[in-house]
Amino acid sequence: MKISLDQTQAKDKGEFLARFYLTKEQSDDASVIFVECRTRHYKTKMKGAKRMYFILGGSGSFIINEKQETANPYDLFIISNGETYEYSGAMKMLELNVPATDSSNYEKLD
């Protein structure tokens, strides 16, 4: 299966843009999102899934469970079930969720 950019659904949240390549409605196994962070992503707690961010370009920082790390191209960040995270900077990232997630799999904390 191939999914092209023109087949994705985009959600512009202002601080970041998300393009949904594979959603929970399409697959229970995983969800895949291209994220373009413009400024920041609010603090979030994961519920019932693992979320991974692969940095494609740009730079910034991630805070996972109150520990801050710099983010550069080709870095991978892994957020497990129950962990909190937020990020900031100007970055392009691939987000992978296992199993697939929707709004029931995270809690916005700020």
Feature roles, as predicted:
Residues 1-31, 41-43, 109-110:
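A short, N-terminal "cap"/entry segment at the start of jelly-roll beta-barrel domains
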Residues 37, 45-62:
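Short, conserved beta-strand element in jelly-roll/cupin
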Residues 65-82:
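Short acidic-glycine-tyrosine-enriched beta hairpin
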Residues 81-106:
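Ligand-binding loop in jelly-roll beta-barrel domains
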